[in-house]
């Protein structure tokens, strides 16, 4: 049974890196004390993979799991194959997906998660769990072979969702960008995750976690609100 924790981002308000996720992860990894977590760092553009791995190790030290970045092996897939848990970090979603294609990780991760290996990711790491990365907020600074992602959650995700426009901003709002996507892709569903929220997916159900409701946008920008702690079939 699929068991995934898809988190909007690594911070909430003024909290330090990944601090607000620790209660969720403590529950999520309760049965994996002392186990190995394969970490995929490809989204980290402004830091080396070594630096990214260390940053996550320090942030999650109290969880009593071994964080091992896939770049530590010549064949990155080997670490995924042996891992008890899979984690994918945030950053640039295009770089992340390109790296996953280059190292042939998508079918392997998909198979392992469908077979029950826990998966958690934040920001870009949540985005790639969905059908495609077409609703990321990131600049396309590189070009993956396809926008198709893991499709473990067979819908679109939009992490870091914020409604409306900041004062003085004259570009498109997030709602306007998602409206554009739904005009071109009218059969899609987009789950918008505000900061401080997550989806805990178990099998074919998902629970909303965090401080805010999750929003579901569908054709013609129909809006459904998914309250905190609600459970829905997807």
Curated annotation (Swiss-Prot):
Family matches, as InterPro entries: Class_I_gatase-like, Peptidase_S51, Peptidase_S51_dipeptidase-E
Q: Which UniProt keywords apply?
A: Cytoplasm, Dipeptidase, Hydrolase, Protease, Serine protease
- SS bond list: none
The protein's matches in Pfam families, at most eight in alphabetical order, are given as:
Peptidase_S51 (PF03575)
GO cellular component terms listed in the entry, alphabetical order? cytoplasm
SUPFAM superfamilies per the record?
Answer: Class I glutamine amidotransferase-like (SSF52317)
Q: Which CDD domains match?
A: GAT1_Peptidase_E
Which one of the record's GO molecular function terms can you name? dipeptidase activity
Q: Where in the cell is it found?
A: Cytoplasm
Instruction: Give the record's GO biological process terms.
Output: proteolysis
Active site residues of this protein: 123, 138, 160
What the entry lists under Gene3D superfamilies is as follows: 3.40.50.880
According to UniProt, the reaction catalysed is: Dipeptidase E catalyzes the hydrolysis of dipeptides Asp-|-Xaa. It does not act on peptides with N-terminal Glu, Asn or Gln, nor does it cleave isoaspartyl peptides
Q: Does the keyword Protease apply?
A: yes
E.C. number: 3.4.13.21
The family classification in the record reads: Belongs to the peptidase S51 family.
Q: What does this protein do?
A: Hydrolyzes dipeptides containing N-terminal aspartate residues. May play a role in allowing the cell to use peptide aspartate to spare carbon otherwise required for the synthesis of the aspartate family of amino acids.
The protein's name: Peptidase E
Q: Which organism is it from?
A: Pasteurella multocida (strain Pm70)
Name of the gene: pepE
